[in-house]
Design a protein with these regions (language model features):
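C-terminal functional module detector
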Residues: 19-21, 25-31, 36-242
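The substrate-binding groove and active-site-proximal loops of carbohydrate-active enzymes
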Residues: 3-13
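Catalytic-loop motifs flanking and including active-site residues across diverse enzymes
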Residues: 16
Length: 242
């Protein structure tokens, strides 16, 4: 029921990404999206509307339906400056790669073009950095190939970011990330009991706040929210295992 996750907005992008990675580790396929909305009080914003953007591979003909289909298929990357290219085993972002059981070595191809320097260009797999691509010269361009060992099901993406703010990017720091490429090895599911347990604790805290809250419009509104939390808890409890 969720077409994408807003990985970039008026938040800390690395912190948001860490939560996103946990959801991906639970087996959810969640493409990256971005957005800033447009609030009336612009003085409170750290950057203008459109500061964070989602780019979608929609083919040679651009129209609204193809663009939406590209978002849902995960053919996206999000950014406030750097532009990224990423493929794994000749598969593009958003693809599902199916491999036989056993160990494999897939070639990842990465590309970076940016109008500001970045300090890190990394391939993330199952929530961990699995490759760091060297950045040379002005740290604004890169093109490289890396061999990634793959032995279990999961996901891989490319991200770039800086350690500090860099004009003219009016954000905390330059940042960009592709959506994942998903890899299935044999019949292995993508699961993480630890990450599922993290969300169970999160749901417990939300439920406590919902029960204690006194600002509900009606009792049925509160009951509906609590019902949704019960459904969510059942999903993550099944993922967490016994």
């Amino acid at each position: 029921k969720v077409d994408y996750l807003e990985v970039m907005g008026y938040s800390d992008h690395l912190i948001t990404s860490a939560i996103w990675y946990r959801l991906l580790n639970c087996g959810f396929r969640l493409p990256a999206g971005a957005g800033t909305d447009a609030f009336p009080n612009f003085a409170s914003l750290r950057g203008p509307p459109g500061l964070t953007r989602v780019f979608v591979r929609s083919g040679t003909q651009l129209d609204h339906r193809r663009w939406l289909d590209g978002v849902k298929a995960g053919r996206t990357f999000v950014t406030n400056a750097p532009l990224l290219e990423f493929s794994l085993g000749s598969h593009e972002v958003g693809a599902v790669v199916r491999l036989a059981a056993g160990s494999h070595r897939l070639v990842a191809r990465v590309g970076l073009r940016s109008n500001v320097p970045v300090d890190h260009l990394e391939i993330v797999g199952n929530g961990q950095v699995v490759a760091m691509i060297p950045l040379r010269g002005d740290r604004m361009t890169a093109s490289d190939s890396v061999v990634i060992p793959v032995a279990r099901s999961g996901w891989y993406l490319l991200r770039a970011y800086g350690d500090r703010a860099a004009m003219p990017v009016l954000d905390l720091y330059p940042f960009a990330s592709t959506s994942p490429i998903y890899v299935h090895v044999g019949d292995q599911p993508v699961r993480s009991a630890n990450d599922a347990a993290f969300f169970l604790r999160w749901i417990d805290r939300i439920e406590s706040a919902a029960r204690a809250g006194a600002s509900w419009n009606t009792p049925s509104e509160q009951a509906d929210v609590l019902s949704q939390l019960t459904l969510a808890r059942a999903v993550f409890r099944a993922l967490a295992g016994p």
